[in-house]
């Protein structure tokens, strides 16, 4: 009986100590041990020995199975996540738009801009100068007709008959008026004075008043003639076609860069409210837009941003080099800290493994003692 009990105790001790030692040898010793030139077996422990390999494998596992573009994309497009981000963005936008700060102070605090109005004007002037140079540089191979929007070309051509009618109406009204008749008399006098002998001969036979009385009805008749309308319409059409065929570069001499920049600056200062908004509190001028921004623009912006992120996830994760980050972090993690972490999580399980070893050892001791008794 004592033999059986002794063998059970010895087996249990051996089994428990063996399993406990095996668990310890997962982490210890932390470094290689030597006696002279000879390295002791099983040093360092399993995890310290495979630390770098473990870091590499963890990096691969994280990239391949844990942090993937598919998983992140699925999370980003979940309705709950999208709704929470949208609500947060709405709150922040309302908070920003109702702020007492001005655009000038925000630019100064966040971007160290001392004179925001001067900066805006400088940027607009630079943009106008660049656009002017680029537009006329590209104009070398283009005509006015090519540069004009099609809607403008169509509108001009559609209104040419109206322009013709307006010109003829104005001309008829002017010629038929007393002012027009007086101007005709002046023109006849000027004509006779500048044509020497011919003018003197005409003056001998016809007085100025008589010439006006003769020419005035004929001029009105000419202006009311349908052929005159056709002639004027053809003239307008031809001039319009000639204008469209002119190179864009031809108009550069009439449009100076300095004038364009000056007019743009004046319009910005007097007509565009941004300049006036710069020094005012945000809530003073954003009130009419707050609801539209928060309820319409922000949700659309959130949706577009999330879709853009999802479409670029593969590229972003590749550029982040997550595998390398995980490998470096795990490699930098001390084995002592790793041991504490694993034991804090699995201490109960490791104890059960030790007890299981003792139980198996005790069972083996019992079997051995019974075999010995049978042999005797």
Curated annotation (Swiss-Prot):
Q: Which PANTHER family match?
A: UPF0754 MEMBRANE PROTEIN YHEB (PTHR35791:SF1)
The topology of this chain with respect to the membrane is: Multi-pass membrane protein
**Which domain of life does the protein's organism represent?**
Bacteria
Where does this protein come from, organism-wise? Answer: Halalkalibacterium halodurans (strain ATCC BAA-125 / DSM 18197 / FERM 7344 / JCM 9153 / C-125) (Bacillus halodurans)
Q: Which GO terms describe its cellular component?
A: plasma membrane
Listed name of the protein = UPF0754 membrane protein BH1148
Chain ranges passing through the membrane: 3-23, 355-375
Q: Does the keyword Transmembrane helix apply?
A: yes
Q: Which InterPro entries match?
A: DUF445 (IPR007383), UCP032178 (IPR016991)
Keywords of the record, alphabetical order, are:
Cell membrane, Membrane, Transmembrane, Transmembrane helix
Family designation? Belongs to the UPF0754 family.
Q: Give compartment(s).
A: Cell membrane
Where is it mostly found?
membrane
């Amino acid at each position: 009986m004592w033999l059986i009990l002794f063998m059970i105790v010895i087996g249990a001790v051996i089994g428990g100590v063996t399993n406990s030692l095996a668990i310890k040898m997962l982490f210890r010793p932390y470094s290689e041990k030597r006696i002279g030139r000879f390295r002791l077996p099983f040093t360092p422990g399993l995890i310290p020995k495979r630390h770098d390999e473990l870091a590499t494998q963890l990096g691969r596992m994280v990239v391949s199975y844990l942090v993937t573009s598919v998983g992140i994309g699925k999370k980003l497009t979940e309705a709950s996540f999208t709704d929470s981000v949208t609500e947060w963005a709405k709150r922040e936008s309302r908070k920003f738009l109702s702020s007492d700060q001005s655009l000038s102070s925000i630019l100064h605090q966040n971007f160290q801009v001392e004179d925001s109005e001067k900066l805006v004007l400088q940027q607009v002037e630079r943009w106008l100068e660049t656009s002017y140079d680029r537009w006329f540089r590209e104009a070398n191979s283009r005509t006015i007709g090519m540069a004009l929007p099609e809607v403008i070309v169509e509108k001009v051509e559609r209104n040419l008959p109206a322009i013709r009618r307006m010109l003829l109406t104005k001309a008829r009204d002017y010629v038929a008026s007393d002012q027009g008749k007086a101007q005709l008399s002046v023109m006849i006098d000027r004509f006779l004075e500048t044509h020497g002998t011919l003018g003197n001969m005409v003056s001998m036979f016809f007085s100025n008043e008589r010439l006006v009385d003769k020419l005035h009805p004929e001029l009105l008749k000419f202006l009311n003639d349908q052929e005159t309308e056709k002639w004027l319409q053809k003239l307008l059409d031809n001039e319009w076609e000639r204008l469209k065929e002119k190179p864009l570069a031809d108009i550069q001499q009439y449009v100076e860069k300095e004038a364009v920049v000056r007019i743009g600056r004046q319009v910005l200062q007097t007509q565009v409210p941004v300049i006036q908004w710069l020094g005012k509190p945000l809530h003073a001028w954003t009130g009419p837009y707050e609801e539209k921004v928060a309820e319409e623009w922000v949700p659309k912006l959130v949706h577009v941003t999330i879709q853009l992120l999802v479409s670029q996830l593969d590229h972003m994760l590749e550029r982040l080099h997550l595998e390398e980050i995980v490998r470096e972090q795990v490699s930098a993690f001390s084995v002592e800290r790793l041991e504490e972490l694993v034991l804090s999580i699995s201490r109960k399980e490791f104890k059960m493994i030790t007890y299981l070893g003792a139980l198996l050892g005790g069972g083996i001791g019992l079997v051995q003692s019974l075999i010995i008794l049978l042999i005797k």
